[in-house]
Design a protein with these regions (language model features):
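Domain-level signature for soluble enzymes in the chorismate/prephenate branch of the shikimate pathway
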Residues: 1-274
Length: 274
């Protein structure tokens, strides 16, 4: 039986993503942090890890991007799940009674209108929305609430005191499955290839690096800049391309790109997720 790790408890959005990515017989392993998931996958403690990588409203999940850049792992699959945020507490609370709201920083960012309305309420970050719900369930402090899912509320015995508190209820988060192997199968018509590159940090270098993709008719579906820690104000670029590196056109484009950048790493190929 394959073992699949994800961050947070059984109530986490990552758990729901892991269930969708691995619907068959598998053992789901709950770990505390994103880095714990990566370490477990790299060490062979689990066969796969599942991590959030992008939100449709807030954008890239920086921690996941940086962890995957440094780890010897490949993205092998992806899926997207709808994210609905609810205000939950141990018992019914009026908004005027709320003193603390716990949630993941991304969830807090997606609920600005609620936080703006609750003037003076202290927002406390948690490692996941599920952990926030767990902390509220275990706390005896009056006036504590969490922004979490209905799944989390049900698991931890909390009550939903306000539904759909997100600024945009149509939010989605994209999750990826990572492993120590790289997929080389490409029987499907559509593929995605994730990669990272560093330019010479001169005028026109970024354009020169990605121009071969446009000339070969390949769609660059994502481009994210991330700072290089040891080089202040310089950046690497994480990207996703519509194509598979074993396809002749994609292979030729990558070969040309390699001659124009300082570093190029392919981070995995996988079918586009639902």
């Amino acid at each position: 039986m394959i073992r699949v790790a994800y961050p947070g408890g059984a109530a986490a959005h990552s758990a729901a993503a892991a269930e969708r990515l691995f619907p068959g017989e598998r053992e789901l392993v709950s770990l505390e942090t994103f880095s714990d998931v990566v370490e477990a996958a790299v060490s062979g403690g689990v066969a796969y890890g599942v991590l959030p990588i992008e939100n449709s409203l807030v954008g890239p999940v920086a921690e996941t991007h940086d962890l995957l850049y440094d780890a010897e792992l490949s993205i092998v699959a992806e899926t997207s799940i709808p994210i609905r945020h609810h205000l939950v507490a141990r018992a019914p609370l009026a908004e005027s009674e709320i003193r603390v709201i716990r949630s993941h920083p991304v969830a807090l960012e997606q609920c600005r209108k609620l936080l703006g309305r609750l003037n003076g309420v202290r927002a406390i970050a948690a490692s996941t929305t599920a952990d926030a719900a767990s902390q509220v369930a275990e706390s005896d402090t009056p006036g504590e609430a969490a922004i979490a899912s209905e799944r989390a509320a049900a698991i931890y015995g909390l009550q939903v005191i306000e539904h759909d508190v997100g600024d945009h209820p149509e939010a989605f988060t994209r999750f990826v499955s990572v492993a120590t192997h790289t997929r080389i199968d490409h029987e499907r018509d559509e593929w995605r290839t994730a990669f990272s590159f560093v330019t010479d940090h001169r005028s026109g270098a970024l354009y020169g690096a990605i121009e071969p993709f446009a000339r070969h008719g390949l769609d660059l579906v994502q481009l994210v800049s991330r700072p290089i820690p040891q080089s202040p104000w310089k950046y690497r670029f994480d990207a996703v391309l519509a194509g598979h590196p074993l396809e002749p056109t994609t292979r030729d484009a990558f070969a040309e790109v390699r001659t124009r950048v300082r570093d190029l790493r392919v981070l995995g190929s996988y079918p586009p997720g639902a």
